[in-house]
UniProtKB/Swiss-Prot annotation:
This protein's encoding gene: hemA2
Name this polypeptide is given: Glutamyl-tRNA reductase 2
Active-site residues annotated for this sequence: 49 (nucleophile)
Entry keywords, A to Z: NADP, Oxidoreductase, Porphyrin biosynthesis
Record's keyword annotation contains Nucleus: no
Length: 423
């Protein structure tokens, strides 16, 4: 059975997470220690800035999660707010993580690779094998379906996302566009980061050049003094104004003259309140002005898209979890059902042979009797097999039925049913 134990940004502080974080130099030895814990058959550890989560395959969930909890608390030297999940809930959580539904930023693309890397490390080290490999492949397939079939990857809601969305409506893709960001504060930084991520070339203008240079380094752009605004307006495709500027910097008369000489569109994004750019400037030909109200409308639309994307993702994940549960039930019930069918088939074969001894050798009769016996075995065991698979899924409520089947059919198969979920 799959179990998960760990903590993440939703229920644990940075201080809690950092004591469990696995540095690269000690990763292999710590992974080996966890793999050697009581009742742990296979193991994978995901360690990022937002989460430290252990996924394990085990035949004894209660013992495995207890040993994992004890090991993690011992590593921290204190009791940690660890979560614990069993079976389908552990798998559901893994798919949500891989789909970025559990990320600090919904839709962020890095998490899928991080999940794959975490499991691959364990596979390479020999502490994860068939069961966790199967879980990983299923989870990655489900997460890719979420990203392909929903708008999760497009559901950003930052100021930068809104600014880029409005600019793209006018100019098309931001790849290679020259974007001038006025200011070096938080609004400027968020806008610069997102536009950089869209492929734009960033120029930061700031009254205090050293602050502008710091932001420029962060986004891979260049910094210039605020006095260069006039020169930059002649070259820019997009200007994001996130700091006070000279009163005449964006005056309609100056912008009209600039527009005539440029002969191409320019998008002005005014993030200031009160506004730094006069509304009349937006009426000039080839000048497209957006203010915070325009950005707010884009962000609300993105939030609505995100809510719809999450709902779509949850539906897909529910389907994928259902497939996982059915596959797990089939896998775990298979030894019991196989033994039951083998015993029934052996009895049927004995009766066929006894009948043939009375009737004498006749290949056609033998063929018909064997076909009839096989059909009877399949039909008699169809319902019991289906109920046993369901009993394995039902956990404790189905344990009595599994035990009864073992007793009634005199089976020796060792099968442990699901012992329930823990959140």
């Amino acid at each position: 059975m799959l179990v998960a134990v760990g903590l993440n940004q939703k229920g644990a502080t940075v201080a809690d997470r950092e004591v469990l974080a696995l540095p690269a130099e000690g990763f292999q030895s710590t992974l080996a220690e966890y793999a050697a814990l009581d009742a742990v058959d296979e193991i994978a550890v995901m360690s990022t800035c937002y989460r430290v989560e252990i996924y394990a395959a085990t035949r004894c969930p209660a013992a495995a999660t207890l040993s994992l909890r004890q090991a993690l608390n011992a590593r921290a030297g204190r009791e940690l707010p660890l979560f614990e999940l069993h079976g389908e809930e552990a798998y559901r959580h893994l798919v949500r993580v891989a789909s970025s539904l559990e990320s600090a930023i919904l839709g962020e693309p890095q998490i899928l690779g991080q999940v794959k890397e975490a499991f691959q490390r364990s596979i390479d080290q020999g502490v994860a094998a068939k069961e966790l490999t199967s879980v990983l492949n299923r989870a990655l397939s489900a997460a890719k379906r979420v990203r392909t079939d929903t708008a999760i990857g497009r559901a950003g809601i930052s100021w930068g996302h809104a600014a880029a969305t409005l600019a793209e409506k006018v100019l098309g893709k931001m790849q290679g566009r020259r974007v001038v960001v006025v200011g070096a504060g938080e609004m400027a930084r968020l806008s610069a980061q997102h536009l950089r991520d869209q492929g734009a070339r960033i120029v930061v203008l700031n009254r205090t050049l050293v602050n502008g240079e710091a932001l420029a380094r962060e986004v891979g752009g260049v910094a210039r003094p605020l006095e260069a605004l006039g020169e930059e307006l002649a070259q820019a495709d997009v200007v994001v104004s996130a700091a006070p500027v000279a009163p005449d910097a964006f005056q309609p008369e100056a912008m009209a003259e600039l527009s005539r000489s440029r002969k191409r569109p320019i998008v002005l994004v005014d993030l200031a309140v009160p506004r730094a750019i006069p509304a009349a400037t937006g009426a000039i030909r080839d000048v497209y002005l957006c203010d915070v109200d325009d950005l707010d409308r884009v962000m609300k639309a993105a939030m609505s898209e995100r809510a719809a994307a999450v709902a779509d993702a949850d539906r897909i994940i529910a389907e994928e979890v259902g497939k996982f549960v059915r596959a797990e039930a089939e896998r775990r019930a298979a030894p019991l059902i196989q033994e039951m069918r083998t015993r029934a088939s052996a009895i049927a074969r004995e009766e066929v042979e006894r009948t043939l001894r009375r009737l004498g050798e006749d290949p056609e009769v033998e063929r018909r009797l064997e076909a009839m016996a096989g059909s009877i075995v399949s039909k008699i065991l169809h319902a019991p097999s289906a109920r046993l698979r369901q009993a394995v899924c039902d956990g404790c409520s189905g344990e009595a039925l599994v035990s009864a089947a073992v007793e009634i059919f005199e089976l020796s198969a060792d099968i442990r049913v699901h012992r329930g979920n823990a959140a």
